[in-house]
C-alpha cells in the first residue's frame, strides 16, 4: 500500500485495491503521518466508510514505528503518538492495531530481563486507552533485536500481560529471518493468535525483504496447514511492499491483481486444510 499511496493518494489507493480484488487493508501509521491530531474524528470515520463502500474493510492498523527511542523524552512523545494512532484507528473501524515492541535497546543476554520489564510497562500503559477506544492491541514478533524475537519470548510477554485487550500479530517473514520455522512457531503460539492477525511476506532468510509469497524460502503450504490446525480465525495481511515497489507505476494495477490472486491461492490452501481438521 505504501508505494501505491504515494502515487495515488489515500482514497485512490482504496479504489485501486478494491478493483484488484482485495477485501481488506492495513491502515499503516508506520509510514503515513496519520498518528497526529491533524485530522478529526469525522475525517477518519468518513475515510473508513469510503473504504467499506468499495468493499475494502480496514481489518487492522499499524501504530507508528519505532515504539521507543534512546531519549526518554522522545519515547514519551512517541507513546502518545501511538495512543493517537489507536484512537484514529478506532474511528476507521479497525478492530485491532499492531503495536511493535520497544527496540530502543538491542536485545542481549545481559539486558533481556530489563528490556522485558520495560516492554511490560509500555504495553500495560496502553491498556486503558485500548479499553477506552474499543480496540485490540496486536503484539508483533520483531526479529533478532527484540523481546519478541522468538515464539517463546513473544508468548512470555503475552502471557504475563494476561489482558483481553491483547492479541498477537504473527509475522511470517520475521520468523523466517529469525531462523525459526514459521509453521512450528504458529503451533507453539497456538490459540494466543487465533483471533489476531498474520503478516504475510517472504524472504530468503538473510534479509527482511518483505516480498510476495513464493519469492523466498517460506514453505507456504505448511504455514497454511499450521494456521488451519490451530483454528486460526484472523486475517492474512500482506506486508509485501517490496514486490510492488519494484514495478513501474504503470504496472501497479496488474501487480496488485497478481498479488490478490496469490493471496486467494493461500486462502484456498488454508480452507483445504481447515476441512481436514
Residue locations for each model-derived region?
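Active-site beta-loop-alpha junctions enriched in small/polar residues
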Residues: 1-5, 28-30, 63-66, 102-104, ...
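N-terminal pre-domain/capping segments
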Residues: 1-94, 114, 163, 195, ...
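Short, mixed-charge, low-aromatic patches
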Residues: 1-8, 39-41, 79-82, 108-116, ...
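Histidine-acidic metal/acid-base catalytic patches
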Residues: 7-21, 78, 148-170, 174-277
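Active-site acidic/histidine proton-transfer and metal-coordination neighborhood
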Residues: 8-12, 50-53, 70-168, 250
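Hydrophobic faces of well-ordered beta-strands that scaffold small-molecule active sites
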Residues: 1, 25-27, 58-63, 97-99, ...
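Catalytic-core regions built around general acid/base machinery
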Residues: 41-54, 122-129, 185, 222-226
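A short acidic, helix-capping loop that chelates divalent metal ions and anchors anionic groups
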Residues: 31-35, 67-72, 105-110, 177-178, ...
